[in-house]
Amino acid sequence: LTPFTHAVTEHDLMRYESVRRSPVLFQERLDKKLELRVTVVGDQVFAAEIHSADDPKQSVDWRRYPSFDLARFYASHELPFEEKHRCIRLVQELGQCFGAIDLVLHPERGYIFLEINPNGQWGWIEQFTGLPIAEAFANLLVRLSTNYSSARE
Protein backbone atom coordinates (compact mmCIF):
# COMPACT_ATOMS: atom_id res chain seq x y z
CA LEU A 1 0.00 0.00 0.00
CA THR A 2 1.22 3.47 -0.84
CA PRO A 3 0.02 7.04 -0.22
CA PHE A 4 0.75 7.80 -3.86
CA THR A 5 -1.16 6.88 -6.99
CA HIS A 6 0.52 4.22 -9.06
CA ALA A 7 -0.28 2.19 -12.13
CA VAL A 8 -1.89 -1.14 -11.23
CA THR A 9 0.41 -4.06 -11.93
CA GLU A 10 -0.10 -7.81 -12.22
CA HIS A 11 1.40 -8.07 -8.72
CA ASP A 12 -1.23 -5.64 -7.38
CA LEU A 13 -4.02 -7.73 -8.86
CA MET A 14 -2.65 -10.87 -7.21
CA ARG A 15 -2.72 -9.03 -3.85
CA TYR A 16 -6.27 -7.73 -4.40
CA GLU A 17 -7.83 -10.46 -2.24
CA SER A 18 -5.98 -9.10 0.82
CA VAL A 19 -7.69 -5.69 0.47
CA ARG A 20 -10.98 -6.82 -1.05
CA ARG A 21 -12.97 -5.67 1.99
CA SER A 22 -11.08 -2.38 2.34
CA PRO A 23 -11.85 0.90 0.62
CA VAL A 24 -9.75 0.95 -2.53
CA LEU A 25 -10.00 3.44 -5.38
CA PHE A 26 -9.27 2.50 -8.97
CA GLN A 27 -9.36 5.06 -11.71
CA GLU A 28 -8.94 4.94 -15.44
CA ARG A 29 -5.45 5.90 -16.58
CA LEU A 30 -5.89 9.18 -18.43
CA ASP A 31 -3.88 10.85 -21.13
CA LYS A 32 -3.44 14.42 -20.02
CA LYS A 33 -2.23 17.71 -21.32
CA LEU A 34 -1.82 18.85 -17.73
CA GLU A 35 -3.24 18.52 -14.24
CA LEU A 36 -4.96 21.32 -12.36
CA ARG A 37 -5.41 22.17 -8.71
CA VAL A 38 -8.45 24.40 -8.44
CA THR A 39 -8.88 26.27 -5.16
CA VAL A 40 -12.35 27.64 -4.48
CA VAL A 41 -12.64 30.31 -1.78
CA GLY A 42 -16.21 31.56 -1.46
CA ASP A 43 -17.16 32.57 -4.98
CA GLN A 44 -13.57 32.96 -6.22
CA VAL A 45 -11.76 30.30 -8.24
CA PHE A 46 -7.98 29.98 -8.52
CA ALA A 47 -6.64 27.40 -10.96
CA ALA A 48 -3.03 26.25 -11.13
CA GLU A 49 -1.51 24.13 -13.88
CA ILE A 50 0.73 21.24 -12.89
CA HIS A 51 2.82 20.19 -15.88
CA SER A 52 3.22 16.56 -14.85
CA ALA A 53 2.71 15.15 -18.36
CA ASP A 54 6.06 16.65 -19.41
CA ASP A 55 8.00 14.11 -17.32
CA PRO A 56 7.28 10.35 -17.55
CA LYS A 57 8.24 9.86 -13.86
CA GLN A 58 5.59 12.36 -12.81
CA SER A 59 2.86 11.40 -15.25
CA VAL A 60 1.01 9.06 -12.85
CA ASP A 61 1.44 11.06 -9.60
CA TRP A 62 3.47 14.27 -9.66
CA ARG A 63 3.65 14.33 -5.82
CA ARG A 64 5.96 11.31 -5.79
CA TYR A 65 8.79 13.06 -7.66
CA PRO A 66 8.52 16.81 -7.04
CA SER A 67 10.07 18.94 -9.76
CA PHE A 68 13.08 21.10 -9.07
CA ASP A 69 12.20 23.41 -11.97
CA LEU A 70 9.22 24.84 -10.10
CA ALA A 71 8.90 27.99 -12.19
CA ARG A 72 8.17 25.81 -15.22
CA PHE A 73 6.23 23.08 -13.41
CA TYR A 74 3.45 25.28 -11.95
CA ALA A 75 1.55 28.14 -13.60
CA SER A 76 -1.76 29.92 -13.19
CA HIS A 77 -4.56 28.75 -15.50
CA GLU A 78 -7.69 30.50 -16.72
CA LEU A 79 -10.59 28.07 -16.49
CA PRO A 80 -13.53 28.58 -18.84
CA PHE A 81 -16.53 30.25 -17.19
CA GLU A 82 -18.58 27.02 -17.15
CA GLU A 83 -15.80 25.08 -15.40
CA LYS A 84 -15.40 27.83 -12.79
CA HIS A 85 -19.15 27.77 -12.20
CA ARG A 86 -19.14 23.96 -11.80
CA CYS A 87 -16.39 24.17 -9.20
CA ILE A 88 -18.19 26.86 -7.19
CA ARG A 89 -21.47 24.93 -7.42
CA LEU A 90 -19.81 21.72 -6.19
CA VAL A 91 -18.32 23.45 -3.15
CA GLN A 92 -21.67 25.10 -2.37
CA GLU A 93 -23.61 21.83 -2.82
CA LEU A 94 -21.30 20.28 -0.22
CA GLY A 95 -22.18 23.11 2.18
CA GLN A 96 -18.64 24.46 2.18
CA CYS A 97 -17.02 27.80 1.38
CA PHE A 98 -13.65 26.24 0.44
CA GLY A 99 -12.53 23.29 -1.62
CA ALA A 100 -9.35 22.06 -3.31
CA ILE A 101 -10.35 20.31 -6.53
CA ASP A 102 -8.08 18.19 -8.70
CA LEU A 103 -8.79 18.07 -12.43
CA VAL A 104 -7.08 16.66 -15.50
CA LEU A 105 -7.17 18.44 -18.85
CA HIS A 106 -7.54 15.58 -21.33
CA PRO A 107 -6.55 16.21 -24.99
CA GLU A 108 -9.94 15.08 -26.37
CA ARG A 109 -12.33 14.94 -23.42
CA GLY A 110 -11.58 18.31 -21.84
CA TYR A 111 -11.66 18.84 -18.07
CA ILE A 112 -12.10 15.69 -16.00
CA PHE A 113 -12.87 15.80 -12.26
CA LEU A 114 -10.72 13.61 -10.00
CA GLU A 115 -11.51 14.67 -6.43
CA ILE A 116 -12.33 17.46 -4.02
CA ASN A 117 -10.63 17.93 -0.67
CA PRO A 118 -12.41 20.10 1.94
CA ASN A 119 -9.08 20.82 3.65
CA GLY A 120 -6.64 20.77 0.74
CA GLN A 121 -3.27 22.46 0.64
CA TRP A 122 -3.05 25.76 -1.21
CA GLY A 123 -0.05 27.70 0.16
CA TRP A 124 2.34 26.18 -2.37
CA ILE A 125 0.05 27.27 -5.21
CA GLU A 126 0.18 30.88 -4.11
CA GLN A 127 3.95 30.65 -3.60
CA PHE A 128 4.69 29.36 -7.11
CA THR A 129 1.96 31.10 -9.14
CA GLY A 130 1.31 34.37 -7.32
CA LEU A 131 -2.43 33.66 -7.19
CA PRO A 132 -3.88 35.74 -4.28
CA ILE A 133 -5.47 32.86 -2.36
CA ALA A 134 -4.51 34.09 1.15
CA GLU A 135 -6.06 37.47 0.36
CA ALA A 136 -9.25 35.75 -0.79
CA PHE A 137 -9.37 33.80 2.50
CA ALA A 138 -8.83 36.97 4.52
CA ASN A 139 -11.62 38.76 2.65
CA LEU A 140 -13.94 35.78 3.09
CA LEU A 141 -13.25 35.64 6.84
CA VAL A 142 -13.94 39.36 7.19
CA ARG A 143 -17.17 38.99 5.21
CA LEU A 144 -18.28 35.98 7.27
CA SER A 145 -17.41 37.63 10.59
CA THR A 146 -19.29 40.79 9.59
CA ASN A 147 -22.35 38.72 8.69
CA TYR A 148 -22.03 36.80 11.97
CA SER A 149 -21.74 40.01 14.02
CA SER A 150 -24.75 41.55 12.25
CA ALA A 151 -26.83 38.43 12.86
CA ARG A 152 -26.08 38.50 16.61
CA GLU A 153 -27.14 42.14 17.07
Region roles according to the model:
Residues 1-78:
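Phosphate-binding site of ATP-dependent enzymes
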Residues 32, 97-98:
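Residues that act as N-cap/strand-start positions at coil-to-secondary-structure junctions
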